[in-house]
Structure formats: structure tokens, C-alpha cells
Design a protein with these regions (language model features):
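TPR/TPR-like (Sel1-like) alpha-helical repeat modules
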Residues: 184-202
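N-terminal glycine/threonine-rich, aromatic-flanked beta-hairpin/loop signature
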Residues: 29-72, 97, 142, 148-162
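Tryptophan-anchored aromatic micro-motifs
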Residues: 25-41, 114-118, 129-133
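Edge beta-strand at a domain terminus
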Residues: 66-71, 98-131
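Terminal, low-structured helical/coil segments at or just beyond the last alpha-helical repeat
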Residues: 200-232
């Protein structure tokens, strides 16, 4: 019996279909929640390519987009805005060649482009909140060694998905635990990245930051000022 043969046109169609499916699998991010590098936003991808992006920019301005990703691209309804998605391992690059049209989905000081990362299990919002609660419990019980081993990995391992303000509060908490455990030098070292801004007056800081951002940043820097004095 002769083996079955297919006309060249049919073979080409079958090959094109397989290539198309492979391309879709490669260029559509896996379902899950991805955090924008540096914090301040997330990308949620559902089965079938449905997605939702929400980010927060300067002065509380935001972006919000949703749609369906097809072959690495999503076109916004009733708009010329098209968003491109480039998965690479546990990251997804988000970009657009239609920035002007996509501005309709953002406040003046916000944007959504950039790298989005799938957080490790210890760096999800829920896991970080649990670590901070456990830290406080250990700190209040004066078990400073346990407090340090509970919170230090968050600052070290979750750096890429934390906002600057969140990192600042983590540093303040860790510095106090280090001080209470008798290591003032470690306290100063932990707070060193905050020292320059903490050394400025409130007025100087308000001249640097937009109003809403200043309201968020100032309490953290005031705590750093106090803790730097305690560690000195």
C-alpha cells in the first residue's frame, strides 16, 4: 500500500497552522499576575489572553487598560491604541508603537510600558504582608533575631517588585530591629540609602516631589531621620 500523500498546497496550509499556533503560544504571556518592575502597577493575564493593566504614576495619576492579547498584541476597543506583549521567562515586556492613542488610557503623569515580573512565592503582595505581620509579632515580643530573619529576605529577594516607599519602610523596620539587637552599625548601614533625602527639610522635599507623592514619601523619611539619630 502506498503511503498517503498530500497536495503541496495542503501541506503548506498545515505548516502555516502549526507555525501560527506556536507563535501564539510564544507571544501570549502565561496566565497569572505580573508586577511592574519597581512596583506601582500590575498586569493580570487570564486564560485565553484576556488581560488587565493598572499602574500608578507621579502625583497619583493612573493608567488602566484591558482587552485580549492575540499573537502578542492587544488592540483597545474603539481606539487606535495597540499594546505589544513580549514574554521572556518570568517577565513580560509591555510596549506600544501607538503612544499618542494609548495616552487616552492614562493620566498625565502615568504610563504603563515597561517590564512586568511574575513575583516569586515569597514576594507576592499576600506573602509580603504576612512577613511584615510576623516581623511585628516577633519585634513586639523582643525576639529581634527572629524579626530580622523574617523581614530581611523580603528586602533582599523582592527588590525588583517593591516601590521605593515600601523599601524605605522595610529599611526603617529592619534598622530598628538591628538597633534593638545591639548592632548600631548595621542599623546605620541599612538606613544609608535613605540618609541623603532624610537630611533634607520637609520644605525641600516638597519642592522635589509632586504634592501627592510628597504626602506618601515624607512620613517614611521622617521615620528615617529619627532612626538615623537613634543609630548614631
Amino acid at each position: 500500500m502506498k503511503p498517503a500523500t498530500h497536495p503541496p498546497a495542503l501541506l503548506a496550509a498545515i505548516l502555516a497552522c502549526h507555525i501560527g499556533l506556536a507563535s501564539a503560544q510564544i507571544t501570549t504571556p502565561s496566565p497569572g499576575t505580573y508586577v511592574r518592575k519597581g512596583g506601582g502597577g500590575d498586569l493580570v493575564v487570564q486564560a485565553g489572553g484576556k488581560f488587565h493593566i493598572q499602574t500608578v504614576g507621579a502625583n497619583g495619576h493612573t493608567c488602566e487598560l484591558e482587552g485580549t492579547i492575540t499573537n502578542g498584541r492587544a488592540r483597545m476597543a474603539n481606539s487606535a491604541c495597540a499594546v505589544d506583549f513580549t514574554p521572556a521567562g518570568q517577565r513580560v515586556g509591555v510596549d506600544t508603537a501607538t503612544a499618542d492613542a494609548c495616552r487616552d488610557f492614562c493620566g498625565m503623569r502615568a504610563w504603563f510600558g515597561g517590564d512586568y515580573l511574575r513575583p516569586t512565592p515569597g514576594c507576592t503582595d499576600k506573602a509580603i504582608a504576612a512577613s511584615r505581620r510576623n516581623f511585628k509579632r516577633a519585634y513586639d515580643a523582643k525576639d529581634y533575631r527572629l524579626a530580622l530573619t523574617t523581614l530581611a529576605p523580603v528586602l533582599q529577594d523582592c527588590d525588583e517588585v517593591l516601590t521605593g516607599v515600601t523599601k524605605g519602610w522595610l529599611r526603617n523596620d529592619l534598622a530598628l530591629a538591628q538597633l534593638r539587637s545591639g548592632d548600631a552599625a548595621a542599623c546605620r548601614q541599612t538606613l544609608a540609602p535613605l540618609a541623603e533625602e532624610a537630611g533634607k527639610t520637609d520644605q525641600e522635599l516638597r519642592e522635589v516631589y509632586p504634592p501627592t507623592d510628597a504626602d506618601v514619601v515624607l512620613p517614611m523619611l521622617k521615620a528615617a531621620r529619627t532612626n538615623l539619630r537613634l543609630c548614631s
